[in-house]
């Protein structure tokens, strides 16, 4: 018996909506990355994008445990000497509510063309309204 390998045109991508209210950042990100990658499906193939579309709402109500709101620091560099910028979780979450979850999920996905295709299937919104009603996303409960 040959090992099954999914073909890109055979894969059915479903749409799910996740409510991030009072969910822990890392646990939610791990569950979302698992779904985006398609590892929950029996047809999972490492070199084929078998994952689903995930719409995350209420990301502004996301939380972190302990003192991470003040202690967790995100770094970025401008490319110029001395151009290192530091931002705490609390500041970033207040200014760009979706960015901490996006960075967490992106770090859990593979790097390269396949990983970039997977992260494009993640849609994040601060409120409870999203423009993807036409896709009829199913509600997905993640215990994070």
Curated annotation (Swiss-Prot):
Keywords (A to Z) from UniProt: Ribonucleoprotein, Ribosomal protein
GO molecular function: mRNA binding; structural constituent of ribosome
Keyword Ligase: no
Gene3D superfamilies in alphabetical order: Ribosomal protein L13
UniProt-listed InterPro entries: Ribosomal_uL13, Ribosomal_uL13_bac-type, Ribosomal_uL13_sf
GO biological process terms, semicolon-separated: negative regulation of translation; translation
Superkingdom field: Bacteria
Pfam hit, one: Ribosomal_L13
GO annotation, cellular component aspect: cytosolic large ribosomal subunit
Entry keyword annotation includes Ribosomal protein: yes
Complex formation: Part of the 50S ribosomal subunit.
Family, per entry: Belongs to the universal ribosomal protein uL13 family.
PANTHER family: LARGE RIBOSOMAL SUBUNIT PROTEIN UL13M, RIBOSOMAL PROTEIN L13
Function (record text): This protein is one of the early assembly proteins of the 50S ribosomal subunit, although it is not seen to bind rRNA by itself. It is important during the early stages of 50S assembly.
Name the UniProt record assigns to this protein: Large ribosomal subunit protein uL13
């Amino acid at each position: 018996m040959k090992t099954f390998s999914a073909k890109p045109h055979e894969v059915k991508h479903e749409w799910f909506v996740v409510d991030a209210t009072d969910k822990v950042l890392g646990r939610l990100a791990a569950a979302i990355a698992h779904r985006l990658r398609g590892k929950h499906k029996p047809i999972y193939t490492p070199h084929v994008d078998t994952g689903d579309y995930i719409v995350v709402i209420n990301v502004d109500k996301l939380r972190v445990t302990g003192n991470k709101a003040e202690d967790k620091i995100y770094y970025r560099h401008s490319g110029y000497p001395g151009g290192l910028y530091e931002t705490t979780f609390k500041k970033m979450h207040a200014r760009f509510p979706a960015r901490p979850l996006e960075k967490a999920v992106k770090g859990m996905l593979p790097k390269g063309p396949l990983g970039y295709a997977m992260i494009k299937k993640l849609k994040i919104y601060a409120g409870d309204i999203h423009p993807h009603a036409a896709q009829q996303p199913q509600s997905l409960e993640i215990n994070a």
